[in-house]
Amino acid sequence: MVDMGALDNLIANMTYLQARDGDSRELRRQHQSLVLPGPQDCAELHRELTPDFHSLCQQQPIGRRLFRDFLATVPSYQVAADFLEEVCSWELADPGSGHGLALQALLVPVSSHPFPSPALATRCQAATTEEELAALVVLAKAEATAFLQDQPLRDFLASPFYDKSLQGKLLERQPVCDKDFTEFRLLGRGGFGEVCAVQGKNTGKMYACKKLDKKRLKKRGGEKMALLEKEVLERVSSPFIVSLACAFQTRSHFCLVMSLMAGGDLKFHIYCVGERGLSPSRVVFYAAQMACGLLHLHSLGILYRDLKPKDVLLDDGGSCRLSDLGLAVHIQDDKPITQRAGTSGYMAPEILMEKVSYSYPVDWFAMGCSIYEMVAGRTPFRDYKEQVSKEDLRQRTLKEEVSFQHGDFTNDTKDICRLLLAEKPEQRLGSREKSDNPRKHPFFKSINFPHLEAGLVEPPICAGPFGEVLPKICDGAVPIAWQEEIIETGLFEELSDPNRCTFFSSSSSSCSSASVVWFLLFFCFV
């Protein structure tokens, strides 16, 4: 007897995987239907916008690309742009025997460039030590950036390149609705709705769509929380936090379209893949990315309040991002807050105490809990599958010392957990002083953070939906069976007919999808 539930799941999986492969012909047709607004339509937008160099020319991808294209048309501007790119490459280069020589080669021609001040040009010629040269690179970088913000920016704003960026901005501002996306399989459910995979019709890119039920939000007073999450996601711009692509509403739902993280959450990897816990290299890598995400939120005055492995998602490549910012809150003028929020087992002592205010240190406490859980396969104050009341868990958090019985706890791991799980916020790593940065702890000695932020550090594992297994299973036809099939069906004779009319069609993606179907059928019905 056929399991119809499994069949539905099979069809959803098949369609989802086909969408991930993409249909280039359909995308080409969709692209041909898109038209940029005309320059004459941008007059009102031109008056409305006040261009900001950092936002327009550095943060926004289209503006950055068009500004770079414009600079390439003026040799003196191109020199400054090339210098900044060379500085960026030098900053990301591994320190070694050639690092000082590269630094010298970077600064020697600076005196002939159009952007440095006479004083800086003189100092560049006179500098001899590596320390002097490194300090001068910082100054030269600042002067090159200031140079580009002056006349080059004014010329860019008067050029057709800026008009093109306005056309892109006007296209970006067009209304978004559910008809702009194709909805695929359900990914998960939550208290206010569900998350499903969707595909943008214009680009073919896959996203996760968080659909919040309006009735549930109204009934449970969740409107402000949903709005706050949307506002927080709009502000963040970090490779370590899920990004918001757009937001729209239907008659029944508010929809947030965000990064699709197909590798599962850390909780799944800790408890459901192999033995409980993660390897030391994975623990350090994920903790480093979590620390970068928290520091970005804190730099924007945002308190996360709900860091835990379940809300840390992995992408196809194996990197992780913080997600589910529904409990995040803006801290106004560094004023602490008192409202209790978070998940039991990850909340800091100051959250659990009555009428005690708290601030950023609570996020570092939750990170300590998460590191402990990744190593030990259990939380610091509750054993695996142990049934504990919220009050007992609260008392344990307030009173008990954390023990490190698991064999994978190294001295550095124990130390960072103790510092992050310190009872008093002022003694907690990341909060002891303004310059207290958890990334400087020896636990992270193997991580090059500039490389990590630039996406140059290889993740310990690839966490795609099937990893390396699916290509090995779905590797094509078995020779004898395939040859028997085309002979028995008469296809071989038809293909061998010299008078047969033929046409070429690229169908590699459909073949790969067919293999996936049989792979899924095996697990559903065998």
What kind of region is each of these model predictions?
Residues 431-518:
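C-terminal regulatory tails of eukaryotic serine/threonine kinases
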Residues 246-247:
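A short, aromatic-enriched beta-strand patch in the conserved N-lobe beta-sheet
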Residues 194-216:
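Glycine-rich ATP phosphate-binding loop
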Residues 286-287:
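Activation segment signature within eukaryotic-like protein kinase domains
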Residues 211-236:
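Conserved N-lobe beta3->alphaC-helix segment of eukaryotic protein kinase catalytic domains
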Residues 184-195:
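Protein kinase glycine-rich loop
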